[in-house]
């Protein structure tokens, strides 16, 4: 056999080998891709089956939730003003929450609640009765129209926990229950769903001056220093401190300006604890019209409040944090 023929045969063998190797690689790659896809699908199916086939997990968690910490549950403290349809919707919704003990409606209108309104709400609560326990409903009537009324001391509260909420905000009951669990782990602090932040002014001519910032600043920085009382848990003792111990000038300021009582409460709690508030992740449903936060000059007014309260307290008590409480039971990965 000549050298040319040997060379041709070797070239043909090399070409056949390369083609075979390419086919093998394609085969292995296709098999690997299919296997990986199969594993992913199997993982998802197994996870779903495991969650659905272990009802004892959720039931045991629910039992632990009911017996842990404050066995009496929490009091819903709802602020309202001439929005009766919203009030009815909110009370009807929260009456279904399993750990709710009572509802106190902060009433500051010049006329008392109508008998038809009271009858409607009481009937709603009767229909929502569970395990023989009917949620107590009370109207806390105030003669003066003041934002401070939402934090007026209630001496005969049965629960330590107070869930302060506006009448136009709805959270799923399981979300409220989770926030209550978080509060039970830190009952001296404020636990809520609506974070806000203050920032120190960097200019030299404004030493110890702070700017109030809203949600987008929190989202961008990942930092907050307060949670708003429009949707927050706190201990009932802070109602007494707000009413009896906080400087009267602050309460007068909030009454006159009709703003910032929520910031004042955040200052009060942070000053008492030297600890940050806790932000809880939760889907919020606002069923009312646009609030005062959309009115022009809102941020400037809130900034003025922050600096006024710093002067009253003699320091900035709010504490920065980046912690966020998330219910891992609702996440695939955590």
Swiss-Prot record:
Q: Which Pfam families match?
A: Glyco_transf_64
Where do the TM regions start and end?
27-49
The active site annotation covers: 262
Further facts: Initially thought to be involved in cell-cell adhesion, this function could not be confirmed.
Q: Does the keyword Disulfide bond apply?
A: yes
Listed GO MF terms: glycosyltransferase activity; metal ion binding; UDP-glucosyltransferase activity
Gene that this sequence comes from: GMT1
Q: Which cysteines are joined by disulfide bonds?
A: 260-305
Highest taxon in the source lineage: Eukaryota
Gene Ontology cellular component?
endosome; Golgi apparatus; Golgi membrane; trans-Golgi network
Q: Which ranges make up the Cytoplasmic topological domains here?
A: 1-26
Q: How does it sit in the membrane?
A: Single-pass type II membrane protein
Give the similarity note: Belongs to the glycosyltransferase 64 family.
Lumenal face residues: 50-334
Q: What is the organism field in this record?
A: Arabidopsis thaliana (Mouse-ear cress)
Where does the entry say this protein is expressed, by tissue?
A: Expressed in leaves, roots, stem, and flowers.
User: Which Gene3D superfamilies does UniProt cross-reference here?
Assistant: Spore Coat Polysaccharide Biosynthesis Protein SpsA, Chain A
Q: Looking at the keywords, is Transferase present? A: yes
> Record's InterPro entries?
GT64, GT64_dom, Nucleotide-diphossugar_trans
User: GO terms for biological process?
Assistant: abscisic acid-activated signaling pathway; cell death; cell-cell adhesion; mannosylation; pectic galactan metabolic process; phloem or xylem histogenesis; plant-type cell wall cellulose metabolic process; protein glycosylation
Binding of substrate occurs at: 145-150, 166-168, 196, 258-262, 289-302
Q: What is this protein called?
A: Glycosylinositol phosphorylceramide mannosyl transferase 1
């Amino acid at each position: 056999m000549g050298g040319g023929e040997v060379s041709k045969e070797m070239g043909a063998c090399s070409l056949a080998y390369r083609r075979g190797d390419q086919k093998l690689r394609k085969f292995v790659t296709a098999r690997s891709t299919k296997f990986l896809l199969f594993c992913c699908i199997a993982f998802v199916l197994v996870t779903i089956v495991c969650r659905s086939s272990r009802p004892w997990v959720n039931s045991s968690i629910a039992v632990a939730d009911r017996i842990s910490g404050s066995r009496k549950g929490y009091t819903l403290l709802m602020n309202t003003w001439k929005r009766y349809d919203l009030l009815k919707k909110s009370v009807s919704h929260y009456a279904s929450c399993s750990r709710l003990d009572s509802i106190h409606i902060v009433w500051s209108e010049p006329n008392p609640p109508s008998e038809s309104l009271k009858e409607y709400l009481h009937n709603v609560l009767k229909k929502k009765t569970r395990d023989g326990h009917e949620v107590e409903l009370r109207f806390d009537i105030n003669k003066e129209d003041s934002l401070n009324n939402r934090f007026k001391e209630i001496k005969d509260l049965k629960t330590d926990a107070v869930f302060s909420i506006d009448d136009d905000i709805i959270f799923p009951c399981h979300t409220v229950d989770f926030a209550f669990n978080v509060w039970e782990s830190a009952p001296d602090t404020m636990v809520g769903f609506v974070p806000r932040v203050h920032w120190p002014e960097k200019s030299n001519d404004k030493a110890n001056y702070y700017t109030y910032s809203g949600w987008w600043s929190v989202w961008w920085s990942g930092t907050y220093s307060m949670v708003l009382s429009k949707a927050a848990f706190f201990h009932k003792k802070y109602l007494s401190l707000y009413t009896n111990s906080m400087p009267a000038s602050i309460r007068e300021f909030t009454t006159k300006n009709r703003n910032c009582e929520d910031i004042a409460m955040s200052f009060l709690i942070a000053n008492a604890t030297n600890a940050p508030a806790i932000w809880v992740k939760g889907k919020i449903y606002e069923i009312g019209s646009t609030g005062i936060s959309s009115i022009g000059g809102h941020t400037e007014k809130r900034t003025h409040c922050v600096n006024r309260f710093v002067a009253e307290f003699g320091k900035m008590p709010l504490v920065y944090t980046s912690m966020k409480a998330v219910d891992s039971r609702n996440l695939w990965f955590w």
